[in-house]
């Protein structure tokens, strides 16, 4: 098969093109990624931001969304005509967002596995004797008795049910030994 005409010439580098400006302009013109999946799926790229949000029943400007009490106006100045409400064409977006917001927040902060193992080891071997814990060979960071007590209290606060189970298992072990 013959070569395509005009493809034998190699590409030459364009020295007169400012690559930094080219990339910056491309970044500016690119539409940002919408993080919220509900809004992203309902988004219409042919419409403006204001139109899209109005269709979803969301407010573009939070100051305009919440009506503020105006000063008292005399009866003659009052207009009987009110502004017509915007038509919400995509109410499911607001419903989904409200449902997502009403879910309980997932607990994201946990303790490291090393700290949990450290607390278990110290309490198993020394009970409530923090000075003995401070002298223990597994106390790699040379924590003071007060620091060790604070670490144990943090563990108790983070995992109260696990702490109760752990203490109960220690009591059972003590009973079996006696």
From Swiss-Prot:
This protein's UniProt keywords: Acetylation, Isopeptide bond, Nucleus, Phosphoprotein, Ubl conjugation
Cell compartments where the protein resides: Nucleus, Nucleolus
Gene Ontology terms: biological process: ribosomal large subunit biogenesis
Sites bearing Phosphothreonine, chain numbering: 8, 144
InterPro entries, A to Z: Ribosome_biogenesis_Nop16
Cross-link for Glycyl lysine isopeptide (Lys-Gly) (interchain with G-Cter in SUMO2), residue positions: 74
Main location group: nucleus
Protein name as annotated: Nucleolar protein 16
Encoding gene per record: Nop16
């Amino acid at each position: 098969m013959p070569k395509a005409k005009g493809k034998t010439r190699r590409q030459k580098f364009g020295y007169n093109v400012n690559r930094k400006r080219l990339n910056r302009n491309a970044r500016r013109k690119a539409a940002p990624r919408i993080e919220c999946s509900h809004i992203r799926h309902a988004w219409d790229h042919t419409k403006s931001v204001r139109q899209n949000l109005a269709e979803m029943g969301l407010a573009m400007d939070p100051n305009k969304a919440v009506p503020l009490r105006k000063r008292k106006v005399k009866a003659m100045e009052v207009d009987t005509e009110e502004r017509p409400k915007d038509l919400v064409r995509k109410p499911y977006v607001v419903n989904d967002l409200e449902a997502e917001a009403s879910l309980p927040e997932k607990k994201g902060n946990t303790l490291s596995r090393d700290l949990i193992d450290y607390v278990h080891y110290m309490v198993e071997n020394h009970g409530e004797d923090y000075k003995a814990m401070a002298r223990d060979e597994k106390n790699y960071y040379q924590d003071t008795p007060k620091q060790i007590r604070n670490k144990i209290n943090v563990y108790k606060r983070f995992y109260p049910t696990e702490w109760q189970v752990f203490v109960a298992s220690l009591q059972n072990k003590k009973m079996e030994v006696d």
